[in-house]
């Protein structure tokens, strides 16, 4: 399936991915309290060393930022949504005239200064009667009616916004000048002639593929529609002159999975019309990679059913350079050493050293092994060892990345990194990998159900949980996905 690269204990992370901020790759995500189909929290940016370089909330809504979107624009601004209760007349949908709705607001914020540059409220522009949601027993102050459900926001090259509203079955183009709706695509009041094959329902992750020309759009169609009973990714041709929409290609996995909520479709290289596509199934434990014609290249189930969900799935390059030291657990009784380095992506090999004193200026190289996963296990049973054992992480060119502390089988001790090295043997030890969630006590904590997690593809899949159809040329890539346990069904 894949091996862990990095994990941390941020609470209930959502929309976890690699983006660009101020010209550098960064990790971004939301963290906070996950509620019934929305959330209250804030937004984080980490640099390549996993250091938090920005943390903010929507302006005027401290710690009330929603889970569904955190996009950084080319202007180093952030697009973020807010769900907040306001009064509304619900008689058009069978509710009270003094009812309550979740107003879906989004803001564009200058990340560096914290200044709000733009704000848009759904209730100012979209009527309650456009919704496909049922008011049922909600519509009160304690249980507002979720009539719009914003779940994707992006900004095009002209300064206008593309907004997805799940329970409207519609995508909106919003003027960046005055907030007026330029057009509606799909839904009850569509301004487009949408061919039947291109119609969608309860969608997520609407994006322009070509942000300048705005002729192709991707959408994750949760469904079901009148003709399709499973979830799929859609590549649509959008003609804003003729006001027509047609299907260029749809994308589905082999199981024809239905994801009730969440999901994503990512063109891996949006500048290339022949690019592959990454398809994530949100509330279901599947992701897939497909070629431009919808042929499945990779089809994976990464967990048991109804245990975890990954809001969106991405395939993105990432180079992690942690400031922490690598970790070692040395089991003296089993004469086994375990090596890991949370977040490091460039480790090619672990070299094992031994000495009789932690402050020794000379350490003896006794063996080495290629990194085989998040945690690499090295058998030292046939090697004569001194009192202390430690490891050195090196990259593919042999460059030193970092040294672990020294262990005596009981405790870990500080030891100098600037040392002389003696060589005992040129042989390499046998090793095995472990990405288990039960990490050794001296290692950085493994992923939990509420961790932000980056995972890298491995060269093999495990058991029936993964269906590896074509796994070639992936060694340089890193998957980035947020894995979050949901205690119950929520329309996220």
In which residue ranges do the predicted regions lie?
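Ser/Thr-centric signal marking residues that sit
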Residues: 372, 376, 404, 444, ...
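Fungal extracellular serine/threonine-rich, low-complexity, intrinsically disordered "mucin-like" regions
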Residues: 413-461
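Cleavable C-terminal sorting propeptides in eukaryotic secreted/cell-surface proteins
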Residues: 458-492
């Amino acid at each position: 399936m894949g091996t862990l690269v990095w994990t941390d204990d941020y609470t209930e992370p959502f929309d976890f991915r690699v983006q660009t901020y101020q010209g550098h790759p960064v990790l971004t995500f939301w963290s906070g309290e996950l509620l019934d189909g929305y959330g209250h929290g804030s937004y984080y940016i980490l640099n390549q060393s996993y250091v938090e370089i920005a943390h903010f909330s929507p302006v005027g809504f401290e710690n009330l930022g929603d889970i569904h979107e955190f996009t950084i624009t080319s202007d180093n601004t952030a697009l973020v949504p807010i769900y907040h209760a306001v009064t509304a007349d619900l008689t058009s949908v069978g509710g009270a005239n003094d009812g309550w709705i979740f107003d879906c607001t989004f803001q564009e914020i200058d990340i560096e200064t914290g200044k709000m540059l733009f704000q848009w409220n759904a209730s100012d522009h979209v009527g309650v009667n456009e919704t496909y949601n049922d008011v049922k027993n909600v519509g009160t102050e304690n249980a507002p009616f979720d009539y719009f459900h914003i779940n994707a926001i992006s900004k095009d090259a002209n300064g206008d916004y593309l907004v997805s509203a799940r329970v409207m079955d519609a995508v909106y183009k919003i003027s960046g000048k005055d907030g007026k709706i330029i057009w509606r695509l799909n839904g009850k009041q569509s301004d487009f002639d949408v061919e039947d094959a291109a119609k969608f329902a309860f969608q997520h992750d609407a994006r322009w593929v070509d942000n300048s020309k705005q002729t192709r759009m991707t959408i994750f169609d949760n469904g079901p529609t009148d003709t399709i009973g499973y979830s799929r990714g859609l590549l649509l041709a959008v003609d804003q002159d003729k006001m027509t929409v047609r299907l260029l290609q749809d994308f589905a996995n082999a199981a024809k999975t239905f994801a009730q909520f969440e999901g994503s479709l990512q063109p891996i290289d949006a500048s290339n019309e022949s690019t592959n596509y990454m398809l994530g199934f949100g509330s279901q434990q599947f992701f897939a990679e497909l070629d431009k014609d919808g042929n499945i290249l990779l089809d994976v189930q990464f967990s048991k059913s109804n245990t975890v969900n990954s809001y969106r799935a991405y395939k993105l390059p990432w180079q992690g350079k942690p400031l922490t030291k690598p970790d070692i657990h040395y089991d003296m009784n089993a004469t086994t050493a375990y090596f890991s380095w949370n977040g490091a992506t460039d480790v090619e090999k672990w070299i094992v050293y031994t000495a009789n004193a932690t402050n020794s200026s000379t350490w003896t190289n006794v063996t080495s092994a290629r990194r085989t996963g998040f945690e690499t296990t090295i058998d030292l049973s046939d090697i004569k060892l001194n009192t202390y054992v430690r490891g050195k992480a090196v990259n593919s060119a042999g460059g030193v990345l970092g040294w672990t502390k020294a262990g005596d089988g009981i405790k870990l001790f500080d030891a100098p990194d600037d040392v002389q090295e003696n060589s005992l043997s040129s042989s390499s030890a046998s090793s095995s990998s472990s990405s288990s969630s039960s990490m050794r006590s001296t290692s950085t904590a493994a992923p939990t159900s509420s961790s932000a997690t980056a995972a890298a593809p491995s060269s093999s899949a495990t058991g029936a949980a993964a269906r590896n159809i074509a796994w070639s040329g992936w060694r340089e890539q890193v998957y980035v996905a947020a894995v979050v346990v949901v205690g119950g069904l929520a329309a996220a």
